[in-house]
């Protein structure tokens, strides 16, 4: 029996080593917190050069991590940019584009949305054992065939938990001084309808049974009264406030319409609660701000506190919310094993104004803004990555990177695999972030406006430092030389409101980041060579585009029967926020 003891001992050692190894692999997978702000300009943050806007928490995040200064969004509007972020693919590949002027999900009554065959970063991480949560703005669609099918709900894209706004802020969402009065009136009106309905049923049953003698005309008149009452109520509530400005927890609508000024604070509390619930396991939290999109709902604590009006107030409130999330990460002991990423979905909205008040963001030295497919101001966004011990603090990276890079990056750090049946346009950022390589893996980036290619960026691998950018199409500014499209509020992608360039306008962003002076064969010896190189790359890229249905074209038309409703249609106003408890459990779905 004695010879067996070493074997038993060795077996125990091996078992312990395997256990430790498995535990070590688990520990190597970081928690992931992705923070995306809505419509934030790259020039709005202190860490990107703004010395009049107070953003201390985001600035601290930048000091503690890596700051990307040429971080590029795949689109200059919300829905397509976010689809590219989630999938690591240009929106043209998934069909999250339009050949017309409606380039985002228009409302919650359209069947358009991110196709279900797309693989999101949440789905990828879920396969790696992550608990996945989305808190905040979605804007990737909701329903397909009925107001309750929720085919485009975040749960169908890999998220286990959802609390937030399935649409996006619009001007109707805030302020809403009559909200509480209408909620009370609707409650009384619905009670009246129920009483009349009970009376109709009672009289009908009584007449058919011979218990009461009432004319059918009276019964039909009461039925007609209910229908007319419902129609009158529905007709008086056609504003997006009632049908699009709502909050959901899981599948349930909790506020319709929502109190926009308190929504952000509730979402931060939800985020902190999510972090606490999952502090002992590996998780993904995608916190998608409603800030700083117009109409800029801001709490009283921050109203009037900045040097930049309501927009500045909203930015500084957003920064304080980022601080609360970062503090919670520290408080729950998650700091050292949590990768935090911060960005904006696209550039600031230059044309967002109320009188002389600027309600949109500042894009610094970069030309253009939100809605412009090629100009730098619409697509160059903040990019900050912090992962203590893995990513060096205080590092600055000027290489071109993309929001599409986040999916392959989280796949890399989690041990996941990228889908092999489709083109993934993003690249793993970790070698660049950790300093293992000098250059971005991107050689070309393609800049679309809807379904139209507007510009191409070329980053040669010759250590010249040049970043060439060729514009095939540029918007016509209104008024001329204004730098924006103030007549239409957003610039167009095609037709008479754009200028087509042949040969394309050429800039070297390393020398002219503001894209102020186009290069010519007379001023740039490499002009013709660069134009030809870019044209060849564009041709190769276009050959990889597989035709799909454009979600934001024909499907982006409203259907009344798809309008979400928290009650019995059309009596849909409700406030259940205080009544609904937070779902808990292994998958958090409700």
Curated annotation (Swiss-Prot):
Q: Please tell me the species this chain comes from.
A: Homo sapiens (Human)
Please give the superkingdom of this protein's source: Eukaryota
Swiss-Prot/TrEMBL catalytic activity: an aryl sulfate + H2O = a phenol + sulfate + H(+)
Where 3-oxoalanine (Cys) occurs along the chain? 78
What family, per the record? Answer: Belongs to the sulfatase family.
Q: What is its main location?
A: secreted
**Residues bearing attached sugar chains per UniProt:** 50, 117, 336
Can you say what this protein is called?
Arylsulfatase F
The protein's gene is named ARSF
What does the note accompanying the cofactor annotation read? Answer: Binds 1 Ca(2+) ion per subunit.
Instruction: Show the taxonomic lineage.
Output: Eukaryota, Metazoa, Chordata, Craniata, Vertebrata
What EC number(s) is this enzyme filed under?
Answer: 3.1.6.1
Q: What is the purpose of this protein? A: Exhibits arylsulfatase activity towards the artificial substrate 4-methylumbelliferyl sulfate.
